[in-house]
Amino acid sequence: MARSLSKPPFCEVKLATNNSVTKIWSRRSAILPQFVGKTVSIHNGRIFIPCKISPEMIGHKFGEFAVTRKKPIHKKKK
């Protein structure tokens, strides 16, 4: 079933109330307008990826900006 359009965006309460957000483990939280201009570190499962929040990111999820998979490196033929 699809998500209803009448539901508000999800954001962890701790993120919305804290003014000094630096590390984010909640990748499912939506980016709100109050985060614009801040630099946050988003956890990708292994390390924290620094990311500066811009106005274009509002409404997206934090997890979209920290990839969790490595790109494959193929051997070159000699």
From Swiss-Prot:
Keywords from the UniProt entry: Mitochondrion, Ribonucleoprotein, Ribosomal protein
Subcellular location: Mitochondrion
Gene Ontology BP terms: ribosomal small subunit assembly; translation
SUPFAM superfamilies: Ribosomal protein S19
Listed GO CC annotations: mitochondrial small ribosomal subunit
Keyword NADP: no
GO MF annotation: an example: RNA binding
Main localization, broad class: mitochondrion
Ribonucleoprotein as UniProt keyword: yes
PANTHER family referenced in this protein's UniProt entry, alphabetically: RIBOSOMAL PROTEIN S19P FAMILY MEMBER, SMALL RIBOSOMAL SUBUNIT PROTEIN US19M
Record family assignment: Belongs to the universal ribosomal protein uS19 family.
Protein name: Small ribosomal subunit protein uS19m
Organism: Prototheca wickerhamii
